[in-house]
Regions:
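Extended alpha-helical targeting/anchoring segments
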Residues: 21-523
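N-terminal non-cleavable signal-anchor helices
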Residues: 7-10, 219
C-alpha cells in the first residue's frame, strides 16, 4: 500500500490499453447510460481524450480561471514510482461548512443552516446515493473535496467538547466543495478523463428528463474539453522582484513562551500524564500575490505524495503533506504513521548509511512504535476483531529532501460502520497530538495560545462509492486576508531540549515559506 492520493504504479509499467491509440473516446450512448443507471443512481458520463501535451497545473489554470471555488489534487513522487492520477475541478454545485456544532450549506444561490455537525450532514447527504459501477472508471469521479480542521475533533470525542464555551459565531472547522464535474489526468495512458455525473433522482422517474440530464452531462464534458484545448495558455508570470528578501515571519508565541511551554509539557510527562505532546506554533507573513504560484513553487521544491491546492472562497489552502491520515476503499482501511526523519545523502552510500542510522536509532524507534500502537488502536475500534495487520514495519521511505520511518497498517472495516466512523476513530492523527491522544490534546488546548484551525486536521475527498482518502494537514499553508500562515510542531518527550524544539518548529515553517520567496522572485 502506497501513501499518496489514490494509485501509484511502476514507472516501467506497460499498462497502456489499446484505447490509448484513440485520440478521442466519446461518452457512452444514452442506451448504455440507461443500463448503467440500473446499477446505481449516480451515473458517470465520461469523455476520454489524449493529453500528452498538457499538464495538470496548465489544465487547472484553464478550467478554474478566476473561480473562487476549485481544487487540484496531485501526487508528485520521486524514486521508482509515479502517482497515476491527478484530479481537478471548479465551479462546485454546493459548499458545506462546519462551524462549531452547526452546518452551513450554500447551493442554488441560497444559504441554509442546520443544527448538526458537518460530518453527520455530509453522511446523510451521501446516504442512499451510490455510484454505478463501470470497469476502468477513474478512482475519483465526483463527490466532496475539502478539509476538516483539528478543532473539529470535538465532533468525535465528547471529552473534548465544552458546550458552555461554544461561541455564537464559531469559526469554520470544515469546508467541503461538492463537484459533479471532475477532470482526471491518467499518467499511464497519457489521457484526460473528463467526468460529469448525473443524479438520476433528479429525473423524477421521467424518461425524457433523464435524457435531458444525460445530454447536459455530455455537453458539459465537451465544454470542459474545449476549455482545456482551445483556451490560450496562461502567460508566464513575470518576475516581480529579482532581489526579493527572505520572508519576515511572525509567530503567535514568543520564543520564551514556547520554550516555557515545552518545559510544562515535560512536567506533565514526569507526572505520568502523557508520553509525548506535539506542541506547535503558527507563523504568518504578508503575501498579496497569486497563491497558485506558491503551489507551483512548492511542487518544484518539495514534491510530496499528497499535493493539494484548494480555493475556498475567502481563503486558499496550499500543501505538500507526506502523510496519510486514513483511507477507506470498500471495507479496507489503510493507515500509515510516519515518525523518524533523516536528510537525504549526497551520494547513494551516504543515503543508505543515513537510512540505516535512522532504523537503529533507539529514540526514533521508541517514538515510532508508540505511534504505530496508537494507530493500531485507532483502527481496531472500527475494524473486525483480529483484522488489523502490520506491513512494512519501520520501512525507510525516501522523498525528495528527507527519508522517514514509515509503517503500513491495514484492517477490515466492521460491518455496520462506514468511512465516517473510520475518520472519527483516527482523527486527528497521533503523530500531530502525542500520546495518550486525548490527554495530549487537553494539554495542547491548555498551552497553545490559539485554536489550531486546519493545522493537524485533514485534507480529504469522499466519493459516491463510499470511498475516502485523506492526508494530515501538515506542511500546509493557509492564505487569507493578505497573509500566509503556516503552523509547525515538535514532538516533546521526556528528554526534549526546549531550545532545540523551538528551532525545529522554525525550520519546518521556514521550509514552507521558501515557496513564497520563490514565487515572489518569479517562476
Amino acid at each position: 500500500m502506497e501513501s499518496c492520493w489514490l494509485l501509484t504504479v511502476d514507472t516501467g509499467s506497460t499498462a497502456h490499453g489499446s484505447d490509448n491509440l484513440m485520440l478521442d473516446l466519446q461518452p457512452p450512448s444514452f442506451e448504455a447510460f440507461e443500463r448503467e443507471a440500473r446499477q446505481g443512481n449516480v451515473v458517470p458520463v465520461v469523455r476520454s481524450v489524449l493529453a500528452d501535451l498538457h499538464t495538470p497545473v496548465g489544465a487547472f489554470m484553464r478550467i478554474a480561471g478566476d473561480s473562487t471555488y476549485s481544487f487540484l489534487l496531485e501526487s508528485v513522487e520521486g524514486g521508482e514510482r509515479i502517482a497515476r492520477y491527478s484530479f481537478l475541478g471548479a465551479e462546485p454545485e454546493m459548499i458545506v461548512r462546519g462551524k462549531g456544532l452547526q452546518t452551513i450549506v450554500e447551493r442554488d444561490g441560497k444559504t441554509e443552516s442546520y443544527l448538526k455537525v458537518a460530518t453527520e450532514w455530509v453522511r446523510d447527504y451521501f446516504r442512499g446515493r451510490s455510484l454505478a459501477h463501470r470497469p476502468g472508471l477513474v478512482p475519483f469521479a465526483g463527490g466532496a473535496v475539502g478539509y476538516i480542521g483539528y478543532d473539529a475533533a470535538q465532533w468525535f470525542e465528547p471529552a473534548l467538547r465544552d458546550d458552555n464555551t461554544q461561541p455564537l459565531d464559531p469559526p469554520t472547522d470544515a469546508v467541503w466543495m461538492f463537484f459533479r464535474n471532475v477532470i482526471a489526468f491518467d499518467r499511464v495512458k497519457q489521457r484526460l478523463e473528463i467526468v460529469s455525473i448525473v443524479l438520476t433522482e433528479e429525473a423524477g422517474g421521467s424518461h425524457e428528463r433523464l435524457r435531458e440530464l444525460y445530454d447536459r452531462a455530455v455537453a458539459r464534458t465537451k465544454e470542459l474539453e474545449d476549455r482545456i484545448f482551445e483556451t490560450p495558455a496562461a502567460p508566464r508570470v513575470e518576475t516581480r522582484n529579482d532581489n526579493a528578501e527572505s520572508v519576515a515571519l511572525q509567530s503567535n508565541w514568543t520564543r520564551r513562551a514556547f520554550e516555557d511551554g515545552v518545559r510544562e509539557v515535560k512536567e506533565h510527562i514526569a507526572a505520568g500524564d502523557c508520553y509525548q505532546v506535539v506542541l506547535s506554533q503558527r507563523f504568518s507573513a504578508q503575501f498579496d500575490g497569486d497563491p497558485l504560484q506558491i503551489y507551483r513553487a512548492l511542487r518544484a521544491i518539495n514534491p510530496s505524495p499528497y499535493m493539494f491546492f484548494l480555493r475556498l472562497g475567502d481563503e486558499t489552502v496550499v500543501g505538500a503533506s507526506p502523510e496519510m491520515l486514513v483511507r477507506c476503499h470498500g471495507q479496507r482501511l489503510d493507515y500509515r504513521p510516519i515518525a523518524g526523519t533523516r536528510k537525504r545523502g549526497a551520494t547513494e552510500t551516504e543515503d543508505w548509511m543515513l537510512g540505516e542510522d535512522l532504523k537503529t536509532d533507539e529514540k526514533e524507534i521508541a517514538e515510532h512504535m508508540m505511534l504505530v500502537d496508537l494507530g493500531r488502536n485507532d483502527l481496531g475500534r472500527v475494524s473486525d476483531y483480529g483484522s488489523v495487520k502490520v506491513d512494512d514495519l519501520m520501512h525507510v521511505e525516501r522523498y525528495s529532501h528527507v527519508q522517514h520511518l514509515e509503517t503500513s497498517l491495514r484492517s477490515r472495516l466492521r460491518d455496520g460502520l462506514d468511512r465516517f466512523d473510520a475518520l472519527a476513530s483516527c482523527f486527528p492523527a497521533g503523530t500531530v497530538t502525542g500520546a495518550p491522544k486525548i490527554r495530549a490534546m487537553e494539554i495542547i488546548r491548555e498551552l497553545e495560545p490559539d485554536r489550531r484551525g486546519l493545522y493537524a486536521g485533514s485534507v480529504l475527498y469522499m466519493d459516491y462509492a463510499d470511498n475516502l482518502d485523506s492526508c494530515i494537514a501538515i506542511r500546509t499553508m493557509v492564505l487569507r486576508d493578505g497573509k500566509a500562515m503556516v503552523q509547525a510542531g515538535a514532538g516533546i518527550v521526556a528528554d526534549s531540549v526546549p531550545e532545540h524544539e523551538y528551532v525545529e518548529t522554525v525550520n519546518k515553517a521556514r521550509a514552507m515559506f521558501r515557496a513564497i520567496e520563490m514565487a515572489e522572485r518569479g517562476l
